[in-house]
Structure formats: structure tokens, C-alpha cells
């Protein structure tokens, strides 16, 4: 396979981590919800872009302040469930849209910023109001085998 074809087959993943205080806030939420399979707080992140097309991502050094507004339960690609903390953060949505405008792709009709709290758990959705800080954006090649590797 030529290098150009290989690069065309690779995508781009952009994520952002939570600061320590925000991680601890979400750990308290996990405990309150009595989740059976809580995700390790060191794995907490928000996906900014999951693009099946490789793009050059302009680096930003910023902190986003987001409000967790709802805890929800989503069906995953492998048919299981994930408990997610859905958040409102207009600046993060703008960052996502900027990356789409320079050639990134997105598999879903809408971008919903969220942090996964647990896999293979089911809860009743509920509204909450918790502020979190998103720091340390990172970029890596898109892992199209992510579901298979995290089973």
C-alpha cells in the first residue's frame, strides 16, 4: 500500500481532558448513581472530533468551562449501554464546528459534548447542574477498532 493511500485511510481523533477537581466531581456523581461499572476517572474525556478523514488540527491552548446538564443512557455501537454526562459548552461546540469546516468529518447529525461515566450500565435519565473544566486538548490517529479493543 502506498503511503498516500495509508494516510487517506487514517482518521483524526481530538479529545480534551478534565481538570482534577472536575474528575472528582464526576466520581461523586458515579457514586451517587451507584454505577456497577464506573469508568476510571483517568479515562474521563470529551470527544471534540472523531473524523474518519485525516486533517491537520490547529493547536489551541484553552480551557473550556462546561455545564453538565443531564445524565443519560445511550445504546452503544456494540449493543450495550453507556451512562453519559451530557454537557452544554458553546465554545466547545464552536471548536468542533471549526474542525469540521477545515475538512473533519462527523458520523452523527448532531455533536453532543459528553463524558462517559460507565459502560454496560443502565440508568433513568436525570437533569443535574454541575460545572466542569475541560483542559489539555490532545490529538491522535483515529482508532477505528476502538469498540473491539475496549470490550
From Swiss-Prot:
Top-rank taxon: Viruses
Entry keyword annotation includes Hydrolase: yes
Single annotated GO MF: hydrolase activity
Keywords: Host-virus interaction, Hydrolase, Inhibition of host innate immune response by virus, Viral immunoevasion
Coiled coil: none
Keyword Hydrolase: yes
A Pfam match: Acb1
Reactions catalysed according to its record: 3',3'-cUAMP + H2O = U[3'-5']pAp[3'] + H(+); 3',3',3'-c-tri-AMP + H2O = A[3'-5']pA[3'-5']pAp[3'] + H(+); 3',3',3'-cAAG + H2O = G[3'-5']pA[3'-5']pAp[3'] + H(+); 3',3',3'-cAAG + H2O = A[3'-5']pG[3'-5']pAp[3'] + H(+)
Binding residues for 3',3'-cGAMP: 13, 108, 140, 146
Residues annotated as binding 3',3'-cUAMP: 13, 108, 140, 146
GO BP terms: symbiont-mediated suppression of host innate immune response
Active site: residue positions: 45, 47, 114, 116
InterPro entries referenced in this protein's UniProt entry, alphabetically: Acb1-like_C, Cyclic_Pdiesterase
Function: Counteracts the host CBASS antiviral defense system. Phosphodiesterase that enables metal-independent hydrolysis of the host cyclic di- and trinucleotide CBASS signals such as 3'3'-cGAMP, 3'3'cUA, and 3'3'3'-cAAA. Does not cleave cGG or cA4. Besides evasion of the CBASS system, might also enable evasion of the type III CRISPR systems that use cA3 signals.
UniProt similarity note: Belongs to the anti-CBASS protein Acb1 family.
Protein name as annotated: Anti-CBASS protein Acb1
The encoding gene: 57B
